[in-house]
């Protein structure tokens, strides 16, 4: 519960920023039409989220989860402070870049902690499902939190400006929770715990007792090299990674595009104010709740495939991870059409809101399908596959919102929604092809063939790979540790 709470808290600033657009445009003299220049701060947040984990998450494999949590969380707080007191727009863009990076590192470590504690597909199903929910909901809750704060904030002057209170409030409650996290969080990284025990025994007995990780520790340079090079190679040469990255990246880009387009469509069509549009965007979170409720059914379908696996009897097949993501992807597509064509004055506002909710169901379903499939199919290379997908996902989240104003203004709400829906429909083919032809596709992949575990240590090694692979759920790429502890 505590680590999932961290996932929500560190995701909130990503979505809450846009609630202060009107105030920031006046304060910084930044024009938001026809090009949404204020979206550069969202772009910088997501680019930080894409890049920072590649460098910093691998380091936690040696130092442990606890130092990583608190260093990342304190840096996150410091750059929230910088955003709150920014005196110009350039400062805001820069501080959000570092804040987004620290947020993503923190969330990645949350994913690692889950895999440290819960071993095996069945045991990890519920924690993974909840973590996937908090990863989406933390960002999706941001617009409502931000709009509620500016609605009751002070005048648009000086340090008491409404938009600054978005950061003040988050600074206060995040700082207040640091002691709580310190009390409840414990180190979960197994080899770090063993190193501490070995060190204690050496001190108490004087005997040369060492943990295996102390004797066979990869260098930081090697960790960082693999953390950058292998995901890049997979993103350029592995068709599954390429198409799954496009699939999840488009869905993630829509999540961030909605932060501006919902304000645009509901403000123009229904005359909704900032707080009302923030409430509308809660529909994405509600969609993620629905997806979470149905996720145990997906896990049940997946575990049943173990009896049909001829390649590795007794093990569920990777394609079993995608069964509900196919209808989920179609719901995502249908929700985009519904949102676009129902955003008209003669249609009640609840109809496009339902469309937003359906899109939220689809985003969650796609998200979980991609993460779980790549983890199963690539096993010991799961960390690198997820790094590639996460890099693309955050890059789309950075740049797709830049198209929001021109897309909906030039095409109109209906055709803009249709264009997005057609792209979503085309990408819905990806999981269907994998379910039908997955075995043949995996047989042609050098990475998948090499990564398949076997032998007496299969379960232990698979769990080790999952340790960093699951971290890809978080919102930034995991480290490369899964590529070493096998």
Identify the residue ranges that each predicted region occupies.
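Intracellular terminal tails of multi-pass secondary transporters
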Residues: 1-10, 14, 18, 22, ...
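Helix-breaking motifs and short loop linkers at transmembrane-helix boundaries and internal kinks
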Residues: 13, 28-32, 63-64, 85-91, ...
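Extracytoplasmic gate region of multi-pass secondary transporters
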Residues: 17-18, 226-292, 366-372
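Extracellular/periplasmic helix-loop-helix junction of adjacent transmembrane segments
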Residues: 20-50
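Central cavity-lining transmembrane alpha-helices of secondary-active solute carriers
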Residues: 40-57, 282-295
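Structural signature of the two symmetry-related core transmembrane helices
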Residues: 67-81, 90, 288, 307-337
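Cytoplasmic helix-loop-helix junction between adjacent transmembrane helices
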Residues: 95-135
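Glycine-rich segments within core transmembrane alpha-helices of 12-TM secondary carriers
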Residues: 123-154, 158-159, 168, 173-177, ...
């Amino acid at each position: 519960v505590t680590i999932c709470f961290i996932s929500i808290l560190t995701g909130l600033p990503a979505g809450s920023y846009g609630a202060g657009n009107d105030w920031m445009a006046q304060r910084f003299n930044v024009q938001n039409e026809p090009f949404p220049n204020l979206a550069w701060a969202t772009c910088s947040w997501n680019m930080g989220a894409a890049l920072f984990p590649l460098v910093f998450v691998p380091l936690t494999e040696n130092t442990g989860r606890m130092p990583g949590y608190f260093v990342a969380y304190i840096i996150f707080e410091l750059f929230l402070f910088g955003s709150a007191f920014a005196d110009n727009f350039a400062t805001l863009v820069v501080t959000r870049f570092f804040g987004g990076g620290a947020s993503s590192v923190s969330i990645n470590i949350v994913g690692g902690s889950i895999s440290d504690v819960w071993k095996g597909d069945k045991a990890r199903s519920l924690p993974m499902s909840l973590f996937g929910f908090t990863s989406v909901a933390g960002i999706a809750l941001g617009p409502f939190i931000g709009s509620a704060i500016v609605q009751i904030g002070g005048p648009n002057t000086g340090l008491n400006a409404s938009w600054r209170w978005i950061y003040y409030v988050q600074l206060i409650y995040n700082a207040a929770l640091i002691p709580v996290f310190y009390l409840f969080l414990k180190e979960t990284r197994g080899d770090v715990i063993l190193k501490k025990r070995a060190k204690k025994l050496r001190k108490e007995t004087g005997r040369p007792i060492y943990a295996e990780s102390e004797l066979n520790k990869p260098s930081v340079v090697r960790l960082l090299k693999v953390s950058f090079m292998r995901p890049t190679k997979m993103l350029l040469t592995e068709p599954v990674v390429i198409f799954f990255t496009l699939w999840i990246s488009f869905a993630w880009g829509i999540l961030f595009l909605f932060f501006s387009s919902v304000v645009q469509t509901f403000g123009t069509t229904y005359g909704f104010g900032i707080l009302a549009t923030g409430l509308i965007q809660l529909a994405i979170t509600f969609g993620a709740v629905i997806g979470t409720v149905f996720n145990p059914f997906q896990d049940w379908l997946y575990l049943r495939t173990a009896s049909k696996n001829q390649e590795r009897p007794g093990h569920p097949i990777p394609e079993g991870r995608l069964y509900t993501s196919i209808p989920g992807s179609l719901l995502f597509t249908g929700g985009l059409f519904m949102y676009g064509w129902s955003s008209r004055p003669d249609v009640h506002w609840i109809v496009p809101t339902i469309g937003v909710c359906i899109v939220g169901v689809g985003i969650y379903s796609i998200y979980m399908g991609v993460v779980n499939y790549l983890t199963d199919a690539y096993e010991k290379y799961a960390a690198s596959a997820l790094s590639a997908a996460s890099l693309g996902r955050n890059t789309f989240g950075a740049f797709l919102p830049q198209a929001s104003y021109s897309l909906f203004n030039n095409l109109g709400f209906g055709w803009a929604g249709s264009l997005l829906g057609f792209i979503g429909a085309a990408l819905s083919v990806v999981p269907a092809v994998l379910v039908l032809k997955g075995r043949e596709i995996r047989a042609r992949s050098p990475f998948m063939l090499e990564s398949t575990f076997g032998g007496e240590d299969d379960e232990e090694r698979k769990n080790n790979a999952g340790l960093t692979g699951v971290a890809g759920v978080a919102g930034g790429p995991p480290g490369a540790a899964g590529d070493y502890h096998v």
